[in-house]
Amino acid sequence: MSTEASVSYAALILADAEQEITSEKLLAITKAAGANVDQVWADVFAKAVEGKNLKELLFSFAAAAPASGAAAGSASGAAAGGEAAAEEAAEEEAAEESDDDMGFGLFD
């Protein structure tokens, strides 16, 4: 497991336990899990999440995901209806552009 993932999971564990996220606690959890994490990574992650509520952050992304999926679904439905019209327009253009002799042949 990567260092970043190890420290991220440790931060999530602390957030779930409603504990303050500090570099010492992050190092303790990663060490208990058998991950070798440098002090600098624990410091960086502790500073990054300082004063932030990770649970709230995660739930805000989780709540936004279905809304974007619904929008994509309606857009694909509209695209399917427009696709048939686009195919008809392409067929009309192909009919207009026939291989009539326009005087541009190389071997006339």
Swiss-Prot record:
> What Gene3D superfamilies does the entry give?
1.10.10.1410
Q: Which InterPro entries match?
A: P1/P2_N_sf, Ribosomal_P1/P2
One MF annotation (Gene Ontology) recorded for this entry = structural constituent of ribosome
Q: Does the keyword Ribosomal protein apply?
A: yes
Q: Which CDD domains match?
A: Ribosomal_P1
What Gene Ontology biological process does one annotation of this record name? translational elongation
Q: Which UniProt keywords apply?
A: Phosphoprotein, Ribonucleoprotein, Ribosomal protein
Physiological role: Plays an important role in the elongation step of protein synthesis.
The family annotation for this protein states:
Belongs to the eukaryotic ribosomal protein P1/P2 family.
Please give the name of this protein. Large ribosomal subunit protein P1B
Naturally occurring in which organism (per UniProt): Candida albicans
Q: What gene is this protein a product of?
A: RPP1B
